[in-house]
Amino acid sequence: VWFWLLLASCSVFVNAQQTPARDFSKETARVSPDWVKDAVIYEIFERNYSQKGDFNSITADLDRLKNLGVTVLWLMPVHPVGRIKAKGTIGSPYAVRDYYAINPDYGTAADLKRLISESHKRGLKVIIDIVANHTAWDSVMMKTRAFYTQNTQGEIIPPVPDWADVADLNYDNAELRRYMIEMLKSWIRDYDLDGFRCDVAGFVPTDFWEQARMEVDKIKPDTIWLAEWESPDLLVKAFNLDYSWENHSALMNVLQGSLPASEIRRVWESQHAKFPRGALLMRFSDNHDERRAIARFGERGALAAQALVFTLDGVPLIYNGMEAGDTTESGAPALFEKLPVFWQIADRRPEFPRFYKSMIDLRKNSAALRRGDLRWLKNSDEARVLTFSRTIGTEDVLVAINLSNQPFFGAVETSGVFEEITPEIGAPLPPDDDKPKAKLKNNAGLPAISLDAFGYRIFRRKN
């Protein structure tokens, strides 16, 4: 929600600056390494990840995360939180007091370095949140007022009125740019990080990001930079990956019944028509800015939404606790408080950990789901059901997802013989039970198909 408000607030400025419009669809996106294309990103809010809310608790949980199948750990801001004008009891982690320091509530620099080192030993990448657009009002940078945007009275101002707890940085200042680039370089050099997730990246000039990326690449070129925005210019030189906010908004509206499922296809086609060739977008149904999908749409609705996230093109995101079926309040005002994930709920919702692990495993074992071309397929009820294929080489995967609370029986536009590969997330069967094997071998019966309410099914073409 906040993203669209921000976009509206700066739309006049953007339109004025982009005349004539640059056609990014004719350009090529920055080339990303294979590990970025194949990534499954896992977002961690350190404060609420555990009762202790520290780095060591995350380190102790790395084996579980590795077994889950995620590949990139995104740590929300690790820096001290500002107290002046702070929101809520503890304050927003996005109100940073010192970019070079560690939040003492989370632990020490040594604790963070150990978390990163232990992650690397398990083949996991680690990125941290960088809030480059603004700082807390008690930031150590306040001693240099020229670093900040000021009104005609010389008063430092927030980026937008609702963000009263932060002060806007002024990227017209060359000294500020140098300070920020040196800070980014130090995090890569001193902590051996694997990249950054950059908060409200579109509020910071693109040419700054391009210069910063060029200089950081000299230290460690094989990194991932994730932009929290949705703008094609960011993906040409600076970033590997951008948010897919428009897809998320469409998905939420479809699930609540205010838009037809075909809106997701329309958004996808619009994105592909304006983004550079080879652009990567991050898909998500949940994150720290949003109310939990399970709280909004129930268990089955949340799983259907995430099934789409795992099977669309792009890179999927998991926000900590989703894999347990956690319903703890998320987004503001929870962002400013201590509200730990209720991990024990997984015992009562065992289908959630099974779903996440099995869907990640399916994706890892399918080149088509990771990198295949996407083609939309017609079906007999496109107001409620999405059907599409993912194809690479000789592998052809068909996905059908019912985004409504009513069962579906109809047909999908396809031909040939398929086997069903939908993960089984019910109670585990005995080791010698051959039912799953039989299910895999049988012809799936397409083009006729049935889907439960909020049901999803995945098929692979038999060659």
Per-region residue spans from a language model:
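Substrate-binding/active-site clefts of carbohydrate-active enzymes
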Residues: 20-41, 46-71, 77-191, 211-220
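Bacterial N-terminal signal peptides
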Residues: 2-11
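Conserved, mostly hydrophobic/aromatic
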Residues: 44, 65, 75, 99, ...
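Active-site groove signature of glycoside hydrolases
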Residues: 165, 179-206, 283-287
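Carbohydrate-interacting/catalytic domains
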Residues: 13-74, 80, 113, 118-119, ...
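Active-site-proximal helices and loops of the catalytic beta/alpha 8
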Residues: 19-25, 29, 189, 199-281, ...
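Short, solvent-exposed turn/loop segments enriched in Gly/Ser/Thr/Pro and often Arg
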Residues: 74-88, 129-138, 199-205, 228-233, ...
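Structural preference for beta-strand elements that scaffold enzyme active sites
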Residues: 41-43, 72, 125-127, 194-197, ...
